[in-house]
Amino acid sequence: MFSKILVGLDGSDFSLKALEFAIDLAKKYQSQLVLVHVVMRQIYAINPPEAGVLAGTAIVRELEEDGKAILAKGEETLKAQGIPVETRLKQGVPAEELLRAAVDEKVDLIVLGSRGLSQVRAFFLGSVSDKVSHHAKCPTLIVR
């Protein structure tokens, strides 16, 4: 039923619960999982011009390293359980990148945590899970 499942990971407890749920589905349906972490493009807007380009570059590099670590931990968990896995580190607007990855990877299901961003950021950017669930071309499962 679900041969390929995309899981959005941001390191939050909610995204880890989503991963646990996706693992159960993968075991049941012998699915491959695609783990996706998105480094938010909005970080560029946070960095004031007077701070310099190098400071912004360092912040993005650190966020990318954090993302790689989140993906590596998820990949290790899945490989230990014999579940086929691929990882993707994206940069941009999280909902848009998750939707793009779902199409590019031809997934049958997207699994996301119900929350990940702080409430303040969610107010300004909107809920990633809400945007993905409304615009995805495949079923979306939101885990609480």
Question: What is the predicted role of each segment?
Answer:
Residues 54-69:
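A short acidic, glycine-rich active-site loop
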Residues 73-110:
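Structural beta-alpha unit
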Residues 50-54, 104-105, 128-129:
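Short, hinge-like loop/turn segments at secondary-structure boundaries
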Residues 109-134:
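Glycine-rich, Arg-bearing micro-motifs that act as flexible, cationic patches
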Residues 3-55, 77, 83:
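Small/aliphatic-rich secondary-structure junction motif
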Residues 34, 86, 141:
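Conserved beta-strand positions in the Rossmann-like core of class I SAM-dependent methyltransferases
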